[in-house]
Amino acid sequence: TQPGATRCAVLASSTRGAFSPSESAMVTASRAVPGIEVKSVAAERRKDPEARRAVMAEVDVVVLCLPDDAAREAVTIADSLGEKAPRVLDASTAHRVAPGWVFGFPELTAGQPAAIRAARKVSNPGCYPSGGIALVRPLVDAGFIAKDYPLVVHAVSGYSGGGKSMIEAFENGTAPHFEVYGLRLEHKHVPELQLYGGVTRRPIFVPSVGNYRQGMIVNVPLHLDTLSG
């Protein structure tokens, strides 16, 4: 234990994937960031609500690396702790457009870094929206595109973001080299793109996956003759 350190818990639903909250990982993280003491729930109890409650009651900040429903449950537990409730950083989609949450995108506006620092609850931006918002919001704020502009956001991602089954399909050669998905135009990132992009019209979002493990390309085509300024 580091005297005076900020105590941080990481809650994950799996010990596999992009983040594995093993004991060695916790020790490495604590040593890598002076002043931060990282805690987690033992792997065999990682889905136990009481174990999650116990660790959240001991820390200053909790990072949620959970599916949406599990993240909502974890926030309910945190809220029930009253004065012992930690600050929450949620990496899921569950709270990105929810009232009472601050969007963790410091470049969004001049006041966003201060809002994040002061917030008790911060929602981590999604991967696709980070690219889309970074492209669109400055143009909206500067008045170059109207808030009701009919935006189309195209994005290509590597396959590692699709989870275990997608990774296996691409790496064993059974997946197509390129695949468009979300063709019902109801992708879970659309509300986030619209709200923090600063637009009033629902964007058309066209996500796709390419045959490469990591990386992302996001583009937003615009008609030059419709731009202001």
Question: Where does each model-flagged region fall?
Answer:
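N-terminal Rossmann-like NAD(P) cofactor-binding subdomain of oxidoreductases
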Residues: 16-18, 29-183
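Short Gly/charged-rich anion-binding patches and loops
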Residues: 25, 51, 73, 188, ...
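General secondary-structure edge motif
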Residues: 7-10, 119, 173-174, 200
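Generic low-complexity segments that are intrinsically disordered, proline-rich and/or Lys/Arg-biased
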Residues: 3-4, 22, 35, 50, ...
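Charged docking surfaces used in two-component/phosphorelay signaling
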Residues: 62, 162-229
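Low-acidity, Ser/Thr- and Arg-rich intrinsically disordered low-complexity segments
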Residues: 1, 6-8, 13-30
